[in-house]
Amino acid sequence: MNQAVWLPKLYPNKQWSNTLSQDRETITENEIVDGKFKKMNLIKGPVLDRIVFAHYKNIFGQTVYKFYGVYRTDIGASNKSGQHIHRRISKKINLSSYI
């Protein structure tokens, strides 16, 4: 299995600006250096699919984790935009594969 678990922050912070599209199908990842977006390095591949448990702050200010699905990096869109673009390929994961 070529997968990794990713726990991105989906709220503003000093190191990363990760945004989830309204339909939850795309995560856009930007690194922040000295308060500015840094152009991300080109991706040459192969890349691991990401099992995403994003953390975000709920209405009480608590950090919570939520499963969003399995995402695959869109190398073409990422290299073109200078951001890392991840597209959802599955809303489910079969945990029996990991036992």
Per-range role (PLM):
Residues 61-99:
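Compact mixed alphabeta submodule
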Residues 1-64:
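Acidic, glycine-rich low-complexity segments with interspersed aromatic residues
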